[in-house]
Amino acid sequence: MQLVVARIGRAHGIKGEVTVEVRTDEPELRLGPGAVLATEPAATGPLTVEAGRVHSGRLLLRFEGVRDRTGAEALRNTLLIAEVDPDELPEEEDEFYDHQLIDLDVVLADGTGIGRITEISHLPSQDLFIVERPDGSEVMIPFVEEIVTEIDLEEQRAVITPPPGLIDESEAVVASSRDEETGEAASGDEAEAPKGDA
């Protein structure tokens, strides 16, 4: 089975290095020297990792046969794809591969159906579930433990406790309308700090 493990970004320097947007929790395994990766578009690959290093918090890779900036620029936006045993599981219990999450039913804690995961979007700050609603619309759900409280692979479902407005925009609380409804806060009142991680 194939998994997207990275996307190639800009060229770095003049010796063929590229920046890489990592899409795996195991970059040292999937993107280490000697790794042979399929590509999308397929005509670009396969690519073999020659060397890698971290520079200013970003992973830089150099591929065999790519020796200059021009060659590196030609790889921009290419997806890197690793072949993975479908029975292989991530090392950590609370980690999942994309293929394990695609097609899971998304439900609220009370069992109310929200939709089905159709895609996982890997952003620098967090991952997002792209969920297709029964009416065909899509909603994006951050894959963070405060919102996604349970992944049950046996039952094929993801249980969520979304904040107001995430699923149903009519539930969203807008600061200006809230002030109009409750009146202006007394000048001596202090705002309560939001709950959660500081």
UniProtKB/Swiss-Prot annotation:
Residues 160-198 are annotated as: Disordered. Keywords: Chaperone, Cytoplasm, Ribosome biogenesis, rRNA processing. One of its GO terms (cellular component) is ribosome. It holds the Pfam family PRC_RimM. Residues 181-191 have a biased composition (Acidic residues). GO terms for biological process: ribosomal small subunit biogenesis; rRNA processing. Residues 92-166 form the PRC barrel domain. InterPro entries: PRC_barrel-like_sf, PRC_RimM, RimM, RimM_N, RimM_N_sf, Transl_B-barrel_sf. It is found in: Cytoplasm. GO terms for molecular function: ribosome binding. Belongs to the RimM family. An accessory protein needed during the final step in the assembly of 30S ribosomal subunit, possibly for assembly of the head region. Essential for efficient processing of 16S rRNA. May be needed both before and after RbfA during the maturation of 16S rRNA. It has affinity for free ribosomal 30S subunits but not for 70S ribosomes. Binds ribosomal protein uS19. HAMAP family: Ribosome_mat_RimM. The PRC barrel domain binds ribosomal protein uS19. This is Ribosome maturation factor RimM. It comes from Streptomyces griseus subsp. griseus (strain JCM 4626 / CBS 651.72 / NBRC 13350 / KCC S-0626 / ISP 5235).
